[in-house]
Amino acid sequence: MNDEQRHQEWIAQRKAEEAKRRERAAECLKDHEYTVLADTDQLKAWRCKAPRTTCYAFDILITRFGIATVGDIDGLTFNVGLSYGIEFLAGDDIGYYIHSKLEEHCREREFDEDAFRAALVTGVCSQICQNTNDDEQYSSLPDWVRNDGGVGEAGRWEELIDLVDTRFATINYGEDGHDFWEKLDELLCEASDINYVEQASLFMSAHYDELGLGCDYWEITIDKPRDSLINRLYLINHAAKAIVAQQAEAKAA
């Protein structure tokens, strides 16, 4: 698989994840009804609830100064208000734009294993190229090792581990390159067990030079919005779309 194919695969995976979240939201709210609680120049409010149950029930409130959702999906507040309206919550860019308007304290984050591993793959490949002085050995390296890393490089993780294991196994103790490949092998083994942000940050801080991350390694983003938070945003988005559609029907009647 070449770089373009890998990039397209990454895009396809992202779209599949988004579709799965939309389907989940639709299933969770399939019986919901959307009732207007307030409709004034100062306040717009809706109750999003299925009959005879409070499961996934929540209210959406919009004032001049902000938007809030409260209820069975855990409360969230946004730093935009009536000028954006319910149409803002009904937008299509959920993971970036809608998320970007959350109040800071609502932006829950978690470890991004793919981003962490992608950074290591790119850095380690750079180190391998710089430390492979023999032209024949360099030519024998896979194309993906010699190319600059990019989106989807986390998918090379197992391939990189296999490559380093194989190269290290062919070099006897005391031979040229033994210490280099041994250290890479040890670091990749350690990195495979890392599963939270603080642990990854300490690891990168201690080994940024050996991993080829550069002195600005601290700028590498290794966390992402919490998965459960994004799922809640999809629930809110689904409800907002239903409310917008309901308003359009009322105007057309």
Model-derived segments and their meaning:
Residues 46-48, 90, 221:
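Contiguous, function-dense segments enriched for cysteine-driven chemistry
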Residues 1-6:
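N-terminal acidic, proline/glycine-rich, low-complexity intrinsically disordered segments
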Residues 7-70, 75:
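Short N-terminal edge-element motif at the start of the domain
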Residues 87-169:
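An exposed acidic His-Trp-rich patch
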Residues 135-253:
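A eukaryote-biased signal for long
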Residues 57-103:
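Aromatic- and glycine-enriched beta-alpha-beta binding-site module
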